[in-house]
Amino acid sequence: MEQSTAYERMMATAREWLAGKSPESLAANSGAQFDAARSVFTIRSFGEEVEIHYPDYSFSPEIDEWHQMSLLHYLNLADGTQPSGEWISLSMMASGMIRGGGFDKMFENLVRTKLGCLPAETVRVACEHMGMQVVGGNADLCVRHDFAPLFPVTMKLWFADPEDDLPGSGRMFVDRSADHFLTIEDTVTLCEYLIVGRLKRELGI
């Protein structure tokens, strides 16, 4: 109950931040589309079209509550900066040394102990089922999963090689422009809960 109440307070705050802001400007700065006739934003997130109704900022279809909050924070902070094409770990974001560094270590440990021990094809299929796009790269598996139009996320995995006694290894990256759209706290939430958490459930690990 307390957790639900805390979430509701945070959502109320997120909506207050957006109150009075021009929906056209919000759309232009975030890469979303705004239909003035319907008073609806349309934004592509994790491969799906999400509608956000203006001015109450309700969602359809209903999506995970933390996904909703992250998108509202994205709309509020987005300043139109275009992705640079340069990838950084979460620890390299502003104020990311502790929260971002903690996530980097958690993900590396997950890959070393569980994710990287699975067959590469099994993980690839699970990633594609979640809407991730397999892209070229210097890893055994490299996938891209865009949280929002201007907020791409990539994941690189090297799978364990028992013959050479090499453990699995992996990193998750965001574009260097990430600080223009989300705080480190929001970025950790979306990477840990909305991406890694879903992938773990998809794989049953």
Language-model region placement:
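Amphipathic, interaction-prone secondary-structure segments
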Residues: 25-54, 133-160
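A recognition module on extended beta-rich or small alphabeta surfaces enriched in W/G with H and D/E
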Residues: 175-205
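Conserved binding-pocket/active-site segment within a compact domain
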Residues: 118-182
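N-terminal leader/targeting peptides and immediately adjacent processing regions
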Residues: 1, 12, 16, 36, ...
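Intrinsically disordered, low-complexity regulatory segments enriched in Ser/Thr/Pro
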Residues: 48-73, 158-185
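Short amphipathic alpha-helical segments
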Residues: 63-67, 115-122, 183-191
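Negatively charged, low-complexity tracts enriched in Asp/Glu with abundant Ser/Thr
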Residues: 1-31, 92-142
